[in-house]
Amino acid sequence: MGKRRTRWPVPTYSRVVPSTSGRVLVVDDNKVIRQLIRVNLELEGFEVVTAADGAECLEVVHQVRPDLITLDVVMPRLNGLRTAGRLRSDPRTAGVPLLIVSACTQHEVESGLDVGVDAFLAKPFDPQELVRVVRSLIDAPVGHVRGPGDAEAAAGHA
């Protein structure tokens, strides 16, 4: 009677009750970070769905239909920047705001801007700043296209 191992990968898809603030898909391979982001957003009235990596994000994004997606950069199977590129190239998710929550290098910030990431938040992050950035991205006008000044502001969050 030893310990039983669970099969890998174990889906982390989870869902809470609907809310009025918006639905956020949180993608991070670190379970503690996923929970930290989830709890902070749920306390502010957001509905949160989680995924353990970019591949899982792409599997569930069309069922979840989030108002915003947070992505870590370094993840197994499919990293955050490649996931962002695939989300931007899909007409069904091209307009969903993307927030990178990661300890990014300048090169990763530039690569993120190139694939259409909307904002960056450095780890460790201030929970109030997380909520502020998520709210501002969800409340931005639909179809808002970043201008040159917006790219500099987005990079400033890294």
Each language-model region and where it sits:
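Charged docking surfaces used in two-component/phosphorelay signaling
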Residues: 35-43
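Short amphipathic alpha-helix used as the core "switch/output" element in two-component signaling
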Residues: 59, 81-94
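Active-site beta3 strand of CheY-like receiver
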Residues: 64-70
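Receiver (REC) domain active-site loop signature in two-component systems and cognate sites
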Residues: 75
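Alpha4 helix (beta4-alpha4-beta5 surface) of REC/receiver domains from two-component response regulators
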Residues: 82, 104-121, 128-136
